[in-house]
Regions:
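Active-site beta3 strand of CheY-like receiver
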Residues: 54-60
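Receiver (REC) domain active-site loop signature in two-component systems and cognate sites
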Residues: 65
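Basic, Lys/Arg-enriched C-terminal extension of HTH/homeodomain DNA-binding domains
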Residues: 197-224
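Short, flexible helix-to-coil linker/hinge segments that flank and couple to helix-turn-helix
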Residues: 96-103, 107-108, 113-163, 167, ...
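Active-site residues of response regulator receiver
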Residues: 62, 90
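Helix N-cap/capping motif at the beta->alpha junctions
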Residues: 30, 40-49, 70-72, 207-210
């Protein structure tokens, strides 16, 4: 995983079937010198075709689209282009929908009512730190944890985490950045990123949201 420079220009693509909404997002981000809109699509199929030629850093992805929706498109992006961050941008604010999208790999989730500042912050944060949590995602994930029974597939019983891995996982759940965690545990940011990837493999999770859910289920952090 790359250790991004905070002054890099972030390449962004958007997939949404409403042209007016796409234009609004592009306009709201046009004044940001560190954001470059590189592609737009009206459905998931068109987006995947574009990604064969253009590699954005971040994708803003709608859920409800014709031909190929966001729910189908997200896992394809994560499988084919694992380095691309995906922010779901939708009218849905249903907790079960949000937690599902985060579990299968979304790096964040915003409603379409989110202001331009929130969208910009989410883009910057997922680019630099891999994930962006807000009140909506936090409530959705905790709601999902309270209603979903722990299963062997969601929390493997034979997982053995080292003390260092547990410490780093707890710090991630406190929303510490990679650099902050590296300073606390006295490791390089690259090593912290490698441990984070190893944690995903060990716990059978695909995203930071999945790691948070695992940590709560395993009793490593408390639900608030």
């Amino acid at each position: 995983m790359k250790n991004h420079e905070t002054n890099s220009v972030i390449k962004v693509a958007i997939a949404d079937d409403h042209a007016l909404f796409r234009t609004g997002v592009k306009t709201s981000l046009s004044s940001r010198k560190d954001i470059q809109m590189v592609a737009e699509a009206e459905n998931g199929m068109q987006l995947l075709n574009l990604l064969r030629h253009i590699q954005p850093d971040v994708v803003l992805l709608d859920i409800q689209m014709p031909i190929m929706d966001g729910l189908t498109t997200l896992p394809e992006i994560k499988k084919l282009y694992p380095g691309v961050k995906v922010i779901m941008l939708s009218m849905h604010n249903d907790h079960s929908v949000i937690s599902r999208m985060m579990e299968i790999g979304a790096n964040s989730y915003l409603t379409k009512e989110s202001g331009s500042e929130m969208i910009y912050d989410a883009i910057k944060t997922v680019y630099e730190q891999d994930f962006f949590f807000n009140d909506l995602t936090n409530k959705a994930l905790l709601s999902g944890l309270r209603t979903k029974r722990t299963s062997e597939s969601s929390m493997p019983s034979d997982v053995q985490l080292t003390d260092k891995e547990i410490t780093i996982l707890k710090l991630m759940c406190e929303e510490k950045s990679t650099k902050e965690i590296a300073d606390i545990v006295d490791l390089s940011p690259r090593t912290v990123e490698a441990i984070r990837d190893k944690l995903k493999t060990k716990t059978g999770t695909k995203s930071m949201a999945g790691l948070v859910m695992y940590a709560v289920k395993a009793g490593l952090v408390e639900q608030h």
